[in-house]
Amino acid sequence: MNKKLSVQEIILTLQKYWAEQGCMLMEAYDTEKGAGTMSPYTFLRAIGPEPWNAAYVEPSRRPADGRYGENPNRLYQHHQFQVVMKPSPENIQELYLGSLKALGIDPLEHDIRFVEDNWENPSMGCAGVGWEVWLDGMEVTQFTYFQQVGGLEVNPVTSEVTYGLERLSSYIQDVESVFDLEWGNGVSYGDIFREPEFEHSKYSFEESNQAMLEKMFNDFEAEANRLIEEGLVHPAYDYILKCSHTFNLLDARGTVSVTERAGFLSRIRNMARKVARAFVEEREKLGFPLLKNNEEEAK
């Protein structure tokens, strides 16, 4: 690698590469979430028989990981580049290695290891077999074949490739702190995100209102369940995401007991399962249109 790519150049390179592999380029979903997997572009689209190939950057908020902008690698909000392909191409690992090559990382010249790391998100009823991808000793990607989403079996097999953009960029730019990364045009990551990191950490650990958050969770849960009953899948899913983020804020404050924590997670999981079933039913009523489109293209 001669020229060190900025973060935005890394994003643009990955977008171009995966678009050439048949992925639609989506935008980040505008509700707080803890991982790119929780975007409806992955969570909902991974279930049911319809094909789906998409790539997008997803800001992911994890309140408990905030460190007031003082830790070089631990963040309240990090960015994932998410690729989801359904059905999974047989050569998905080769495609992934091709994406590294597009970034100037020749797999033949670097130590790239797929380390078994099966994945699960119990609160959303998700599980899969997968690997961490280590690049010269640093984990930069999570690679997963989904087995279950929202408590439903995933068929056809769906593959997910999740790049940790901060880690990958730190490797490419050879910096120790994410705040020293060049985002683009000479502007550093710290110039953009250090102050928000401090303020969100202060809120999460010191200023959040527990009583208000508990009421919000209850209200969001009630609305999500009501909307599922009304057949409004996507608004319902938004409220499930709000429940998840609200729980994460409560959890970060350290005021949730072990028993209460299990209860919150069970409530989120129940909603996720209901909305997953409702989504498949909705798509079936529509005649699984993307399946028809795919069959017509194959003729």
Swiss-Prot record:
GO CC list: cytosol
Keywords per UniProt: Aminoacyl-tRNA synthetase, ATP-binding, Cytoplasm, Ligase, Nucleotide-binding, Protein biosynthesis
Catalytic activity: tRNA(Gly) + glycine + ATP = glycyl-tRNA(Gly) + AMP + diphosphate
Listed EC numbers: 6.1.1.14
Residue stretches spanning the membrane: none
Coiled-coil region: none
Pfam families linked to this entry: tRNA-synt_2e (PF02091)
GO annotation (BP), single: glycyl-tRNA aminoacylation
Keyword ATP-binding recorded: yes
PROSITE patterns: AA_TRNA_LIGASE_II_GLYAB (PS50861)
GO molecular function: ATP binding; catalytic activity, acting on a protein; glycine-tRNA ligase activity; transferase activity
PANTHER family per UniProt: GLYCINE--TRNA LIGASE, CHLOROPLASTIC_MITOCHONDRIAL 2, GLYCYL-TRNA SYNTHETASE
Protein name: Glycine--tRNA ligase alpha subunit
Organism name: Pediococcus pentosaceus (strain ATCC 25745 / CCUG 21536 / LMG 10740 / 183-1w)
